[in-house]
């Protein structure tokens, strides 16, 4: 399965469209021009999924959530609040009006690949979160270092 990799800055035109960069489009490895956009539950951004990738996500949600449990149904409603969009002939995607407000009034966005999907950030918001003062290396070591050591595949030598 091909995955999009990378980070790209894009301009948003006056109609709310942006051009999907060639590098990210190639990484999506799909002939289908349909995509799904939804608000992220983890950050103030949008998520761009391939249509097939989102179908897999829905299948997973349907297996894991109980439609007769009120809390699960509320969660499902939030996760399914999305729009299907299509690439136009110029490889542009129109950001739906109800989701455009998540991007403030920015004329510039950042597309950040997260493997299964691409985050769509307002440029200013992305710059703020990307420059936060947390110790990134320490957090990675705490979260992933112990997993590598448990698996016996640590490349690091403790000195």
Could you describe each region identified by the protein language model?
Residues 56, 62-100:
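Short, solvent-exposed interaction modules
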